[in-house]
């Protein structure tokens, strides 16, 4: 009698993300790690979502589809490796919002950081994103100067 899975309303979803296509191996490692985690707890994973893009980008298609499914109450559990694999900033807000939708987020590597350590990680993330944008602008400027039609 007592198998709780029979009463499960929504799906169990593994969500993985890397910042760029060059990290696809890391994406696969996340998937395998999270599947092992779920299996060890007797959880049946209904869907695996693999996303490529910045955690600061809230226009990620896979991520938005996941949020939409949560709002439609089709998801009961999201399993992630780290908070920053879900969103880079504002995790607590999303966690509270999704909890109201009946969704539990399970963080496998939930290391506790001091406020100072979190601030340093946030600053490093911001610097990384903006340095990438500067590089992209330089590349664009160079391309513009080389294009004779412009």
List PLM regions with ranges:
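Short, structured surface patches at the beginning of a domain
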Residues: 1-150
């Amino acid at each position: 009698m007592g198998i709780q899975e029979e009463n499960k309303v929504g799906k169990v979803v593994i969500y993985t993300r890397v910042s760029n296509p060059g990290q696809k191996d890391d994406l696969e490692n996340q998937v395998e790690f999270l599947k092992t985690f779920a299996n060890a707890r007797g959880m049946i994973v209904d869907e695996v979502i693999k996303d490529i893009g910045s955690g600061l980008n809230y226009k990620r298609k896979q991520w938005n589809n996941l949020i939409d499914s949560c709002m439609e109450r089709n998801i009961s559990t999201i399993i992630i490796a780290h908070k920053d694999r879900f969103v880079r900033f504002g995790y607590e807000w999303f966690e509270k919002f999704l909890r109201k939708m009946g969704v539990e987020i399970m963080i496998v590597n939930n290391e506790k950081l001091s406020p100072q350590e979190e601030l340093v990680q946030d600053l490093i993330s911001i610097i990384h994103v903006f340095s990438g944008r500067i590089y992209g602008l330089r590349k664009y400027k160079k391309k513009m100067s080389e294009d004779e039609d412009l």
